[in-house]
Design a protein with these regions (language model features):
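N-terminal signal peptide c-region/cleavage motif recognized by signal peptidases
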Residues: 11-14
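A ligand-binding cleft/hinge motif common to bilobed small-molecule-binding domains
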Residues: 85-96, 155, 159-166, 194-227, ...
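Periplasmic-binding protein-like
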Residues: 109-116, 216-251
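An extracytoplasmic/periplasmic, membrane-proximal ligand-sensing/linker region
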Residues: 255-315
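Bacterial N-terminal signal peptides that target proteins for export
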Residues: 1-3
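Hinge/capping helix and adjacent helix->loop/strand transition within the periplasmic-binding protein
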Residues: 44-48, 68-79, 91-183, 244-277
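N-terminal (or domain-start) structured segment
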Residues: 17-103, 141, 167-195, 287-288, ...
Length: 315
């Protein structure tokens, strides 16, 4: 049972209510980080009148919290729930049973761990185009290592790149899922795979040591601090794949309540304090709130469903 939270008032609204952030996992993970950091800044920036309570609700990879919010908190304007790319991937792949992404409202993302395509320092591939051309010529010649299982978010990144290049036989793209990004990059540095697909935070140390080269970062713009790494987009491949950090809210709240949360998140994203938090934790700027984020999530879900069907993850 969720703990009761103290009542408080969101600045700029007329009704006092409790603010609770549900982290759908145990302490220490990305969702816990989102709740704690965003919750802290909501209070520090005086966007709420009392500290935000963080409730941990681990289970089913986020599915337990999702089901609870849908079933028991559908009209509650007092709750925000931490989410990420893993949440939308699991929804698209029916990992939460019959749950669908339209059972909640996606209120905002305010930071992201950028997706990357990486090769060892001595790889013959000098840019993303070289790699794409090699896969088109011989799909079996390039194997990607990634820290998620087949069909997971890391697997999707090279598939999105290949689809954007007009390659339709994506089931022929080789992917080896290993136990996390560290194992994936070790496989590539060791020559066991030709490339690694993962997140920027997983490879920063290897970039600094010179063991790897990043062929592309899968963001809308180059990442601050890594301005020498080109985006996939500027190389002709229209792919943005980031492990965003954000929040959803119950489906049944009013538009005014939804927009109020979007405004609060935008204020957090714009703050110097949040920029410091991102820099200290390896996150890149990625801000989408309100209807903009909702529409973006809808597109991501549809694309993930399509790719997942094509590779047989879902029927």
């Amino acid at each position: 049972m969720l703990a009761t939270t103290a009542a408080l008032m969101l600045a700029g609204t007329t009704s006092a209510f409790a603010t609770e952030c549900i982290a759908p996992a145990n302490a220490g993970g990305g969702w816990d980080f989102t709740c704690r950091q965003v919750g802290k800044l909501l209070y520090d920036l005086k966007l709420v009148d009392a500290p935000v309570q963080v409730t941990k609700m681990a289970g089913a990879g986020g599915g337990l919290a999702y089901a609870h919010v849908v079933a028991d908190m559908n009209t509650d304007p007092d709750v925000i729930v931490a989410a990420s790319s893993a949440t939308t991937t699991r929804l698209a792949q029916k990992a939460f049973g019959d749950a669908t992404a339209d059972q909640v409202r996606w209120v905002g993302a305010i930071g992201a761990d950028p997706g990357v395509i990486v090769v060892a320092k001595d790889s013959p591939f000098q840019n993303l185009g070289d790699m794409v051309a090699a896969i088109k010529a011989d799909p079996g010649s390039v194997a990607f290592a990634g820290g998620s299982a087949a069909g997971g978010f890391d697997h999707m990144k090279p598939l999105q790149v290949m689809k954007s290049a007009g390659f339709t036989e994506i089931t022929k793209v080789k992917y080896i899922g290993v136990d996390g990004g560290a194992d994936a990059i070790t496989q590539t540095i060791g020559g066991h795979t030709q490339a690694m697909t993962g997140d920027m935070s997983e490879i920063v140390g290897f970039i600094k040591s010179g063991d790897v080269r990043v062929l592309a970062v899968l963001t809308e713009a180059r990442v601050p601090g890594f301005e020498d790494i080109p985006t996939a987009r500027e190389q002709g491949f229209d792919v943005v794949a980031v492990n965003w950090r954000g929040l959803y809210v119950p489906k049944g709240i009013s538009d005014d309540q939804f927009n109020a949360w979007a405004t609060k998140l935008q204020a957090v994203a714009d703050s110097a304090e949040w920029k410091e938090t991102m820099a200290a934790n390896g996150l890149a700027p990625f801000t989408k709130v309100g209807a903009d984020f909702q529409g973006w999530v809808d597109g991501v879900i549809a694309e993930t469903e399509t790719l997942s069907r094509e590779i047989g993850v879902i029927q």
